[in-house]
Amino acid sequence: MTAKPHKSCQFKRDYPQLINLYPPCALTTAQSLDNFTRLRRSRLTTPSAQLGQELYVMGQWGLGDGLELLSLLHHWQTQTQSNTRLLVKVFEPNPINDYELKLLWDQSQSLISTPHLQPIANAILKAKPARIIGCQRLIFDDGRITVDLHFGDLHTSLTNLPHSPAHPIQQWLVLPHLASQLSGKLAWQMARLSADDAQLIGVNLAETVQQLAHSSGFSTLNVSQDALNGDASDALPSQIITDEILLHERKLLRQQADTAQAFTPKPATLAAIDHPVAIVGGGLASANLMLSLAERGQSSTLFCKDNELGQGASGNRQGAIYPLLTPENDELSRFFQQAFLFSRRRIEALSQASMMDTNAAPHVTVISHDFCGVLQTGHDERSQQRLDKIIQSQDWPAEIAYAVDANEANEIAQIGIDKAGFFYPLGGWVCPFEYAKAAVDKASQLANVQCHFNTEITEIECDAQAWYLHSQGQRFGPFRQLVLANGAQLTQFSASERLQISPFRGQVSHVPAQFKLSQLATVLCANGYLTPSHQGLHCLGASYVKAAEHFDFCPQEQRENLGKMQESYPNQAWVDDIDISGNSARVGVRMVTRDHFPMMGCAPDVAEILARYELHQLNQQQAEQSKHYWQTTPAPILDGLYILGGLGSRGLSSGPLAAECLAAQLTGEPLPLDWSTLNKLNPNRMWLRKLLKGKAL
């Protein structure tokens, strides 16, 4: 079943407020908007064709009503070659969601005069951007078009963003309504992220904006409305800047930023189309990495120990997907909001592709899923206090989560709950192994990918700056880049055995849909979780056992799963309908980190870290010098080896974005995450966290 329409989300801004924050496009006719877009495109310098594709990176200062962005995306869809890709990074201080965007467009009637923009506008609305702080990555047309929405304080967004030397921002569009917020410091941060010949463009740019741009090394293109309505010959650069001193200042600024983040290393060698990336593992993380690489034209080779994908932790029939929130809305909470929304978009896109391709390509996997929402309730006094603290500590966007009373909880669930809770309207459940298979199916359509099944990698070795893999007498390689994404076996190799990550056994019970239980219309999350039925069964779980002695079916854990629901919802008749007597269940192993962040990035050279620690931590007097050393020196890594794991029990939410970010790192493209989050994901963080503070290991 699907949940009945829940109460309307409490959106707080009406049209007059929105139009004040996101004013209409300065280009008043469809023709002038189109002319301006073509002019912007003509001023772009052709980038190098890495991986057989050209990636154009553009920045936008402000969102406005979005017409400039829509026009650019439409032009790219219809007027450019298929081997050209576009990444637009939009910096907007005031977050906006899909509901408000639609309200803005409907009330202003801005799309009536530009009906050709309606399809891409609908695509953005379907992607469901949310009013959250941070970057939201939207991917369209199988990766040909990517939009990064950076919501929040402009200075924080810019200064915390890594520079991408291989693919810097080539052009900036400055919207008039935010021009007054451009300062010298912000202009220099824009310059840090940009190509040395990047241009700053705008309509009727103020003189102060042009001066700020010139003083930080930008050339400018100031376009008049008259030029766009007629002959565009007046749209010439007002000044071309080639000041070597300014360009040197940019270089120093980049070096300073890189030095400040040296403890989070970046790949030394970028991917190449004739060198496939090797991926060990066959779960959701591996599959999404393969897809993210394929969208960039990058080939990959996957090694899976099982006879098909999704037989490890990704093998459950149903898994809940919703964000992890904290009272502080800290880096962990913000990352999971970004990641959850990205994963949701992935599922939607792959599902849409499977519906379109079913007749032509019957092998395409259909993803069983239902975004029926997730209802979280407390199960005892302590958990209720924790949940209340989360609810009350932040003004959460209604599309992320909102509080409901007992009656509303009953209406959402369609069964008796009789307690207040926190509802995640965009959450739900998805079949993880079908998700993984669909991702690989799509990857195989976009790039040269290979999958080796029944191939358990037992050893990896590095020889002459290349990696080789061993399996049952076979040797695979050489590979310039090797990613370990093999879940419970992540620490089986000597190169990864010291990673600070722990395996936890989890048993998920399968119970038949019957009587009142079968009416459940949303995912319940309390002490354990319970999904709506799929193919006649509900999923109930899950146990959480560290250092388990075996991975067979456990009758005690089956009873404990039932007991969790009995504790969470006492005296509810539907709980009596949960029948575990069939002893149907599935056991998996989740790899968990202490801080609940996944691990993503360069594999740390732990032996070298410890050796340098001994060298620099000899006595208290040298402790401060040691602290400075680790803060400014690139952390030791195993060149060419990467980690993607530690997804814990929320891999459905976190895995796809972690994979997307790693794919961007491997190919040298701009990232959808900031430095603060990358530091939290860094596989070396457990050691570096102490070393950066001058503490003993």
Curated annotation (Swiss-Prot):
Annotated stretches, region: tRNA (mnm(5)s(2)U34)-methyltransferase: 1-275
Main location per the UniProt record: cytoplasm
GO cellular component, one term: cytoplasm
EC number(s) given by UniProt: 2.1.1.61, 1.5.-.-
Subcellular location: Cytoplasm
UniProt cofactor(s): FAD
Pfam family name, one: DAO
One GO molecular-function entry: tRNA (5-methylaminomethyl-2-thiouridylate)(34)-methyltransferase activity
Transmembrane segment boundaries: none
Keywords: Cytoplasm, FAD, Flavoprotein, Methyltransferase, Multifunctional enzyme, Oxidoreductase, S-adenosyl-L-methionine, Transferase, tRNA processing
Top-rank lineage group of the source organism: Bacteria
UniProt key word Oxidoreductase: yes
Reactions performed catalytically: 5-aminomethyl-2-thiouridine(34) in tRNA + S-adenosyl-L-methionine = 5-methylaminomethyl-2-thiouridine(34) in tRNA + S-adenosyl-L-homocysteine + H(+)
GO biological process per UniProt: methylation; tRNA wobble uridine modification
Chain residue ranges for the region called FAD-dependent cmnm(5)s(2)U34 oxidoreductase: 280-697
Task performed by this protein: Catalyzes the last two steps in the biosynthesis of 5-methylaminomethyl-2-thiouridine (mnm(5)s(2)U) at the wobble position (U34) in tRNA. Catalyzes the FAD-dependent demodification of cmnm(5)s(2)U34 to nm(5)s(2)U34, followed by the transfer of a methyl group from S-adenosyl-L-methionine to nm(5)s(2)U34, to form mnm(5)s(2)U34.
Record family assignment: In the N-terminal section; belongs to the methyltransferase superfamily. tRNA (mnm(5)s(2)U34)-methyltransferase family.
Protein name as annotated: tRNA 5-methylaminomethyl-2-thiouridine biosynthesis bifunctional protein MnmC
Gene: mnmC
